[in-house]
Amino acid sequence: MTVELKRNLLESSVEDIDLESKKQRVDNDVDQNTSSVDEDIDYEEDYDEVNDVPIDSGNSLFNNNAKWQETISKVVKSVVSIHFSQVAPFDSEAALVSEATGFIVDAKLGIILTNRHVVGPGPFIGYAIFDNHEECDVIPIYRDPVHDFGFLKFDPSKLKYIEVTALELKPSLAKVGSEIRVVGNDAGEKLSILSGFISRLDRNAPDYGELTYNDFNTEYIQAAAAASGGSSGSPVITVEGYAVALQAGGSSEASTDFFLPLDRVVRALQCVQTDKPITRGTIQTQWVLKPFDECRRLGLSEDREKEARKRFPGKTGLLVAEAILREGPAYNKVQEGDTLISINGTPICSFIQVDNILDSSVGDEIIIVVQRGSKDISFRCTVGDLHIITPSRYVEVCGANFHELSYQMARCYALPVKGVFVASATGSFDLDPKEKTGWVIDFVDNKETPTLDDFIEVMKTIPDEKRVIVKFHNLTDVQTQRITSVYIDRHWCSEFRIYTRNDKTGIWDYEKITEKLPPLPIKPQKAKILDLPINDNKKLAKMSHSLCVVHSVIAITMDSMEPEPTNGCGLVLDAEKGYVIVSRSFVPHDCLNTFVSFAESILVPAKVVFLHPTQNYAIVQYDPSLVDAPVCTPVLANERLERGDETNFIGYMYSNTLISSKTKVNGISSLSVPNDIIPRYRATNLEVISIDSNISTKCKSGILAADDGTVRAIWLSCMGNKEKLYLMGLDVVDIKEVVDILRAGKNPKVSIVDAGFDSISLLQARIRGVPEEWIKMMEEESENRLQFISVTRNSYTTIKERLEPGDIILSVNGKLVKRMRDIGGVVGTDDDTDIESELLFKVVRDAKVIDLKIKTVQIEETTRIVVFAGCVLQAPHHAVRQVKTSIPSEVYAVSRGTSSLALQYGIEVTNFITHVNDQSTPDLDTFLKVVKEIPDNTYCKLRLMTFDDVPFAISLKTNYHYFPTVELRKNPKTGSWIENDISET
């Protein structure tokens, strides 16, 4: 696993406002946001501690080290490495796989203490590795609503070779100057021991930024131990072997670390041990510790300061109100800047006192005294229940997760704790591609959704495939309400479930809410299509009537294409039958939703009817009866464009604005788009057109047309290596055979010579052994370009007689090969039985002319995927076969979830699974047969092969509750995709 410095969960850094140092929490979470940390003035020790720290000069350094060695040897048996997955995005936390540390605090009950940001607020699965490398599953039994600690539970009877012991918690031993050790899983290592000295006991909780988890209303302990990712949850121990604090965070630019005091942990542990509820009270107010001089400036009277300094001689400040949540118990009572004097008559100087009173007063009325403007102000306030305003359930629908807005999120902006929070803005509710967090839903389908239950009731009434209006806002900008239309997808994302936390089992139980409602009938719509603003050419102006925008939404990764919405210009090929041609970068396969829009007024569904394996175009079909608009079938040219020809570019800019420009062809060349790091569809073996116009670089799609309105070429965008976009023209003559077959009511099929080609100069051809008579023939017959076509690669095949890299193509079936399109393949229909035919190639290989019979092949598109352990598996698609010389298995990994078991245990994208439990898995059928026999929550052995043919093996534990095995298969007759659940929990 890659180790990064993050929130001491291997975590992300955050910037300190005053010291300009970045803070981190110490575990293995590589996906957290960054922000600032408030740094205060150094204070003295707590008021009940002795200021003078004795210096032990009587013991030698040797004796001290020996004592530490003895202590550490005992402590390490209580420390565990936690490997975990936060399964689903929830509240402030993203879905992730990570590592952290914990330590045993009750060996009999099997209770492990770790951080709250490790346990997480949402679904969790994990296991603990003990000092002797025994492993045991852990379940979460408590996560504090505010403070950064939680408890995991394991079954001690499952451990056979180690006798675990618990660390004793003694928070009172934490003193300034004390030498400590942090024993944990630092930087992802099995065991690290870091030393340091406590420098502060009264630091405010570090602030890790907005829209992420932050502790508050507690003091933190500060020390210099230089802990890093993976040490979250480590015990901070004294030389006597007592745990005095819990490692939580630190600075990534300094050696400073932040520890959580254990006072509230001790109380919570006692409640768990005695099977009592852990009550947590709140008045929905955040307090911060401020020094006396600042308190005076905020309104603390001199008498109150004098009294506080006398009563708490070790303290240098008091608690001041920082944020009061609207509609909370203290709203319109406490004000920002108020200095807290007492609660129920008890003078207050620390957060621990506040927690003690609130936690024991849930539902009761308390009397609070604050100072404001040098005057005492007293009021009564009813203590609320923190657990009630902490979400314990969420809804999954349309590929997104929702729950009630949490106290944790609302506190950042002093908002009321209410509303429907979007935990994962994905699927239908991908509200803003640039911002994925912080969204709150206000209205759906013109119905208000103030609570999660209201949201559920509204979603129950919405049919599949309906477009509804959603009003929403972001927590960072509550003044701005945004409006968008959402396509309700209940066919790709069929689940409509509610998950509820079960603290007894540690599992989030789910139940199905309702089945999807069938789609409503689509009614024809009318639209006006405006002419292009070309006053001197009415025929060109009418070309807008043949153009549309094709929209695609990919629901699941297939062929290594990530699920995301795309759109681009389409050309109507046949207005009566509804055929539209579009770049394959917008329609990469047919496991998606496709729509066609006209004049930015009508949007109708479409289906994929043809995908060209190499030429980078797709053809979709919509129902023309649904479009009441003057859509026109254009005239396609019969002659090819040549270099120097004048033409007109008409295309859609990235904003979907239609523009046009006079231009000319400045080149026609051969092109194969370079491979991506992860193989995916790419255009190969094309004859492409380039034009003399900068406007083409601003348009991802369009057409080239003659002055009389005849379409000469399709302007396409191709995805290349490292997300680079290639823009080029494809002559319409190259697509006419396919178009004619479709217009005739048949299904086109293409059979190709499956190899990679490129052009070489006559000089290179002569050097590599092409006979002079062939060079002379090329010079005589070629008019525009003098070149030969050479083989650059050979796709994976079992056919023995094949082209080899370096071959120079002289002729095919006796015809001189002058350009790439001369070896473009055979176009036919699905009725043709001989579409895969043999072609007679004459090539130069190793400076010798030889004849080859090369069989053309049909490229099969993907029709089946399997999701196992959160990993999407399929047969290797064509892009993989184009670059591989051997295929180890037909079980190929194209994607894995950010919280998946596949990621946790080490299945990489582009791996091949060759064996499961030592049984060969040459194909998906065999793979499914084997994994069906693997019980839930058990280990299986996987043997894999990397893309570079390096074999390795891993073990993986199944979890069918969160990661079921699912098959998605295309029905060859209807073209629809059917989901089948393979595993049962």
Swiss-Prot record:
<dbReference type="Pfam" id="PF12812">
    <property type="entry name" value="PDZ_1"/>
</dbReference>
<dbReference type="InterPro" id="IPR009003">
    <property type="entry name" value="Peptidase_S1_PA"/>
</dbReference>
<dbReference type="Pfam" id="PF13365">
    <property type="entry name" value="Trypsin_2"/>
</dbReference>
<dbReference type="InterPro" id="IPR001478">
    <property type="entry name" value="PDZ"/>
</dbReference>
<dbReference type="InterPro" id="IPR036034">
    <property type="entry name" value="PDZ_sf"/>
</dbReference>
<protein>
    <recommendedName>
        <fullName>Pro-apoptotic serine protease NMA111</fullName>
        <ecNumber>3.4.21.-</ecNumber>
    </recommendedName>
</protein>
<dbReference type="GO" id="GO:0005634">
    <property type="term" value="C:nucleus"/>
</dbReference>
<dbReference type="InterPro" id="IPR001940">
    <property type="entry name" value="Peptidase_S1C"/>
</dbReference>
<keyword id="KW-0720">Serine protease</keyword>
<dbReference type="GO" id="GO:0006915">
    <property type="term" value="P:apoptotic process"/>
</dbReference>
<feature type="active site" description="Charge relay system">
    <location>
        <position position="117"/>
    </location>
</feature>
<feature type="domain" description="PDZ 1">
    <location>
        <begin position="287"/>
        <end position="385"/>
    </location>
</feature>
<feature type="domain" description="PDZ 2">
    <location>
        <begin position="771"/>
        <end position="847"/>
    </location>
</feature>
<dbReference type="InterPro" id="IPR041489">
    <property type="entry name" value="PDZ_6"/>
</dbReference>
<keyword id="KW-0539">Nucleus</keyword>
<keyword id="KW-0645">Protease</keyword>
<dbReference type="Pfam" id="PF17820">
    <property type="entry name" value="PDZ_6"/>
</dbReference>
<comment type="similarity">
    <text>Belongs to the peptidase S1C family.</text>
</comment>
<feature type="active site" description="Charge relay system">
    <location>
        <position position="148"/>
    </location>
</feature>
<keyword id="KW-0677">Repeat</keyword>
<keyword id="KW-0378">Hydrolase</keyword>
<feature type="region of interest" description="Serine protease">
    <location>
        <begin position="79"/>
        <end position="269"/>
    </location>
</feature>
<dbReference type="GO" id="GO:0004252">
    <property type="term" value="F:serine-type endopeptidase activity"/>
</dbReference>
<feature type="active site" description="Charge relay system">
    <location>
        <position position="231"/>
    </location>
</feature>
<comment type="function">
    <text>Nuclear serine protease which mediates apoptosis.</text>
</comment>
<dbReference type="InterPro" id="IPR025926">
    <property type="entry name" value="PDZ-like_dom"/>
</dbReference>
<dbReference type="GO" id="GO:0006508">
    <property type="term" value="P:proteolysis"/>
</dbReference>
<dbReference type="InterPro" id="IPR043504">
    <property type="entry name" value="Peptidase_S1_PA_chymotrypsin"/>
</dbReference>
<keyword id="KW-0053">Apoptosis</keyword>
